[in-house]
Amino acid sequence: NKLKDKNIKVLFVVNPNNPASIALSRDCKDNLISVVKEHNPELMIVTDDVYCTFVDNFNSLVSELPYNTLGVYSYSKYFGVTGWRLGTIFLNEKNIFNDLIKKLSPYMKNELNERYKHLCQNPAELSFMDRLVADSRQVALNHTAGLSTPQQVQMAFFSLFALIDTENNYKQLTKDICKSRKNLLFN
């Protein structure tokens, strides 16, 4: 019920949770959808879906509330390379983040235009995602934004590997190892 309060602007969700990899229930999702649609349509949701590969038939909040939700995913957990910090952010093209920027006061819009004026001729038209990328590398260094070449290559290899493994053998092996370790720890 707290999320019905329009003073609450953003919800951060780890789904599935860590370390148990338990996803939000259908009832919980339906309740959240109802709250957003009926009471707080400008609620921004950031969902950390890093552990989704460990949950069968996982369905992200991004697919349930695409307008309101920014998703975060990392290859690092699934492929056991946590030191690499390889991840991605995904956002629907039509989203609350862009629309809220358009609703800012003239003063705030001017501040943002001043911040991003070196990126393009019309900074008011920059999307939230473009601003996020620019801010990830400091606006002045935006021309170097993104991952380094070794990281890009590693993410490409991980993506290709996951596409080739059509029977999810690696995923099942990883889940079996996690279950085995849990049993060893608690039994």
What are these model-derived regions, one by one?
Residues I22-S25, V55-N59, T82-W84, K182-F186:
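A short acidic (Asp/Glu
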Residues N1-N57:
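Active-site phosphate-binding strand-loop segment of PLP-dependent enzymes
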Residues K2-K6, I33-L43, K94-K103, M129-D130, ...:
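Alpha-helix termini
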Residues K2-K6, I33-V35, N113, C120-A124, ...:
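Short amphipathic alpha-helices and their capping/turn segments at secondary-structure boundaries
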Residues C28-L32, L61, G71, L185:
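A general structural detector for well-ordered alpha-helical segments in enzyme core domains, enriched
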